[in-house]
Amino acid sequence: MPTNTTRLLPLIRAVLAATSALALVATAQAQEAEQETSSDGDSTTLETLVVNGGSGGVITAEGYVGISSATGAKTDTPFLETPQSISSVTEQQLKDRNPQTLLETLAYTPGTRVGAYGFDPRFDAFFVRGFDVTYTGVFRDNLRQPAAVDSIFKNEPYGLEGVSILRGPSSALYGATGAGGLYNLVTKRPTEDTLREVQVQYGSHDRYQGQFDFSGPVNEADPVYYRLTGLLRDADTEQVGVPDDRAYIAPAFTWKPDEGTKLTILGEYSRTKTGGTATYYNDPATGRATDIFAGNPAFNDSVQKQARIGYEFEHRLNDTFVFRQNARVSTLNIDADWDFAYGPNADDPTLLDSVAGTYDERLAAFVIDSQLEAKFDTGALEHTLLAGIDYTKLRFRALDGRGVSPPLDTKNPTQGRPVDPIDFNTRTVQDQWQLGTYLQDQIRYDAWTLTVGGRYDWVSTDTDTTDLATDSLTTISQKDKEFSGRVGLTYQTDFGLAPYISYSTAFLPNAGFNKETNQPFKPTESEQEEIGVKYLLPNSNTLITAALFNIDQKNGLYLEAVGSSNIQVQRGKLRSRGFEVEANTSLDNGLSLTASYAYTDVKIIQGPVGTVGNYVSSAPHHIASVWAYYTLPEDGPGAGLSIGGGARFVGSSYGNDQNTFRNSSRILFDASVGYDFAAIDKKYEGLQLQVNATNLFDRREAVCTAGYCHRDQGRTVIGSLRYNW
């Protein structure tokens, strides 16, 4: 048996055992609940977080279990009726695991590959089902969150109330998206009940953070509610010269004059300071990562400022029609310096030659989505018909400069090296707009739900590149248009089992041109066949899902060596096939658990010479995880205590598309312990202490993607003291 499979078996068994035990425990609890209900007419249930799922894709959840969301259909739809693999990271999971990045937030979701670039606080780069979704798959409140080059919006987990995940091609509703699917980040919204929280944190690498979250009615007379969330952090990291400082503020207001009308304003501003590079030097002789920081602590600042403001409006016209409109304006500016050691000096092998650079990028985007929902019957058929039109306009500007820097001294690799100011060499300006119109009908007959949807998009992109030394200008204009669709069928049994089958497509316009042919790139297209089952155990807060999928992507972009440089070419085709299973529960006995396993086989069907028939780099066949959190009984000796623990398995993978070397498999462990001081005395009610650790055993192995090697992020421990009143 292959080594990686042998190492995987214990965790797979643990995941499957946890899933089986979960079903047995939940079934037993359901039987007890039925007995209690029959005996006294009442039963104990978990508190349900019910929010309006018609706007922004917010989640209705009970503990760890997502029940419904608008992410899968743009209308509030139960997960059991969504004919596609969908899951969620709920607000309770965020509280228990206290993630500090989006990657940590998503680490326990099935099929999500985080850590492919090791420790790197600059970007939230991740993959799903073998496809990169960093640029194409991140949405905010059901609206596209654009990104370009290094201008990728940073996402603060403390500003989220959850994440909805729709896997697979999803252009039928959302337009330009990739083959892997989309991750909808749900912003914290005003609550009708008063909420007050302040928190201080201290952690590894001199990490200091203070944060607050206030919400409730503005006054007792007006139907206006507010929320104000913010934090301030001063922190170093495991890499010298790479801080992780952040200031974040997010105001929100909701006006609800009647039950049929609602307007929510969502805003945010943040400033983040980190490093221009965080990578380790790769020895060209071996191609592997060393322990030497490849950057320059004296020339490695990266400051990113971003802001957004938008609204969600919903108005019920009558018993049949509801109108919604969501819109957002967002801006991002990143100013960074970087210095990178790339090879031994010819005269002194203890020195490493370096190259330095600087860039200034600005991204501005406007997104608006208008939709009309109608619910009506035609005979025995119940319809939820959705018609909409959305528009995205973005402008991206980049100034880039390259220069020289002193060599890195391997005998003192953390010493800063002075770098002279670097002038900008090129200026790139890109303007893009996308207009899409879509129609979807969810048709219900008895236990059957047929979902049929289609969309047509028009995209126009103009790119101007100026060589500032010669003042020469290159202009590329391209226009794309494409139809996307989805059809799916779901059957719901009386006992909570819901098998489904679906077919969906996606398209993604590509900016730039092929330097070999001087022709614009065609859009990247993908299609998926998926079959699965979802099981919501009766009278138990437990959801188990499983899916089989096949995804074909064509006209993908690849880097290919031509002469002494790499250029983008388009002649690729990828195929991803796999299986996923996930289980989530939050039981009345204080136990919450999430477990998942994903098998993914991603191959290059067409691509650069030497890669055809190979596996995509850093795409493991096996990913599995288990996280459990238990709150001890209030009347027992451990009253007030909560403990949690998790394990994340990442199977072996190839380090490049040529498949000449491999990344080893690894298991990373996380842990949590908390204490509620109200167990000592009621006068301490609302005061809680929590300590979270990620990569508990500090495993920091090399991980290589696209031929370049990084290192896993090491152990971090964060203590939090929280007070709610």
Language-model features and meaning:
Residues 6, 384-385, 529, 617-725:
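Conserved C-terminal beta-signal and adjacent last beta-strands/turns
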Residues 21, 47-194, 198, 506, ...:
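Acidic, small-polar-rich N-terminal luminal/periplasmic segments of exported/outer-membrane proteins
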Residues 158-161, 167, 172-251, 257-261, ...:
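Outer-membrane beta-barrel translocator/receptor signature
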Residues 233-237, 249-316, 329-363, 402-434, ...:
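Acidic/polar loop-and-plug regions of large Gram-negative outer-membrane beta-barrel proteins
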Residues 254-258, 268, 363, 382-386, ...:
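Structural signature of Gram-negative outer-membrane beta-barrels, strongest in the C-terminal barrel
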Residues 309-332, 355-466:
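Face-selective signature of the C-terminal outer-membrane beta-barrel domain
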Residues 314-316, 320-328, 332-340, 523-586, ...:
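Membrane-embedded beta-barrel scaffold of Gram-negative outer-membrane proteins
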Residues 447, 550, 570-656, 700:
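Gram-negative outer-membrane beta-barrel transporters
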